[in-house]
């Protein structure tokens, strides 16, 4: 019997050209491994990235403009696009040392790539000016790991930038980078000894250029210390580099710190829209953008604070609906779109008491149990139990309690596995008995904490059950294990008749930290009114009115206030207009910035010949969702692994409703030889193969390295409306059809369009 592997081998045997040992694999960079990652499509001058410059040496006339753009993108932490700008320079002038310095800067948190780029810059620095050499040397000194002590190395790096300022007093960018590094190093053990001194450096920059994007760094400087010191920068940060989403995000730090959640949410929404607009234009995936998921999850939190229920719910679901990827966006990574989305969706459903929606959504792709980490499964099960409690459903609550036992067993097994692995690792490394014990203890800390949290969550649900069964002694005994916000606990205490405890909890929930948040105040009003404290309830209601301009009054926490408002002679629509601050600067209309959610881009249509020279149109495949594979022809051996993997799962993909279409860099003649190889053995080709020797389709799908003029591996999921729901473009082919099938089945119902 002929195996699929043999068939794929036959496919690739015709005209097979063995690469020389020192040649990179097809799809890999010819310049170096560091270039296999990052952007590989050409840059363009965008505008709106900040008015900044460091004079550089280059033979390419446009190099300075692209360098300045990349520098502005660095200041805005738009690292992926900054690297693209610097790569554009290197593509036109490979001898431009500062292009590689820029690439290293764009990979500041990726030491391996940063070192490789710094080495290239260092090798070319003799062609650079003295100022450029100082910038390059600062990086070279930092990444040589000498001294080994991180604190000393951080201080030396700061000294190197101060030296640039000494040599070139007019250089604003050295000052900006210096401030950025001082702030970054303060988070890694090198404290800031004088915030005023650092702020004075920023004052020097803004005295020369009031709209320099170093406003970003002033926000970071004062964010954790005294937010009001950065209010002016908060107003100017977005306009200083309006094309960079993160520059609109950053003011949200200050406004949130000052409890101005309306202003914070405006900025986070602006950031989300600009990111989504860029995704449509550049075809990058959401989680390829630095800070994207964090911005949007924080937006959900701020919308919760001001009571925008439906907006918060929609954004949480949007995060979950973003495409997942093994390297970029995994449900097990809590800081990804998937991880944040799951956590925030549970938050919204719980805080706004949307119990019917909660019980419906836990059975959908939004909160599928099999996809979740144990921590997320804990939160999901806790949501289910809480919903049943609030609906008075003893049976459903009891089932949730029993379900926790299975999670606890899984966590205990994980704990044992981590201990065994720690022992094996310590033994392999020939560590002492004492060090082995330390390793086991360290390995078990995370799982021990997880087990404890699972047991506590179960106990909290048991407290709920005791309440429903009117077993008040047991309810009060276990009450401390209920994991809810204090204001929600206050309402439960009120329900139990523990008015004094309810008053205490509701007061604690409305301390200064909760200023500007509608939910704690709404609960406080309920508790005060239910405890006969009418005038205090009236005063609290007046405070709520001032911050509720955008609150959705149709959700349970606010519908319960209807009779209280009537008793206090307040109007049915008791909200007051929002306070408009006079320190917010210029704000564009949000709708002009881009869509509020990630929008799948259009799949470029095409017509290409198959091995029989018959024209095949992509559109003819789109009666079903289609997996499109762009592979690098008969000479690509690791393409064989990919095609083999998908061929082995071809029947499963077909049964699940998917077409598979492959586009090759081969000519029609080469495809014909592949078909003939199959025909000799009486087999049918498992896929339709099309020829694109000029790589036109590769370019249209961004599956092409513009800088090195070569095709890249690309795998895409296209729905029946011609939208690209998922993609992988890389130096290496994507060879996990099991993941892609599962992700495709998850994505398709989440992105149904008319």
Tell me the role of every PLM-derived stretch.
Residues 67, 98-102, 133, 176-177, ...:
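Alpha-solenoid helical repeat scaffolds
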Residues 106, 140, 181, 185, ...:
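TPR/TPR-like alpha-solenoid repeats
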Residues 550-607, 619-622:
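N-proximal helix/coil linker or "cap" segments that precede and/or mark the start of modular domains
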Residues 617-646:
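Short active-site neighborhood of thiol/selenol oxidoreductases, capturing the structured segment around
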Residues 640-683, 695-699:
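Structural microenvironment flanking redox-active thiols in thiol-disulfide oxidoreductases
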Residues 711-754:
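Thiol-/selenol-based redox modules, centered on thioredoxin-like
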